[in-house]
């Protein structure tokens, strides 16, 4: 869990990193940061209430983000300083928070994926996985779709500087 990546303070329009962090630090933020928990609960309430536009605005204005692919001098693919060896798999449009939590747990334990970090997305209806690989790790999306019968697996972005 010592892979390095860039982190950015909100809003999402920031292109210059605030600093670098490890995967372990990202895990701690997700599991222990009370202010992030408060924002996440508010985001999930917006989703439950069908207030999608407000959800997007709050998410873009309030949540910090990282570039799991590595350390960047700015948020652009040609600004990669060092690769982390990680890519992101996004699974979206799940039916409920409970389904997302169950899928997160299954995928984290899957021996073939080698998942380093799995968490329920801020809206509560998706899962994000940080797995070993590079931009060519399309096999992971196919594997998850076949094994877990998912229809909504978003491929890892072509641009490694894409935020998560």
Predicted regions and their residues:
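Ala/Thr-enriched low-complexity intrinsically disordered regions
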Residues: 161-162
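Signature for HUH/AEP ssDNA processing cores
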Residues: 1-125, 132-148
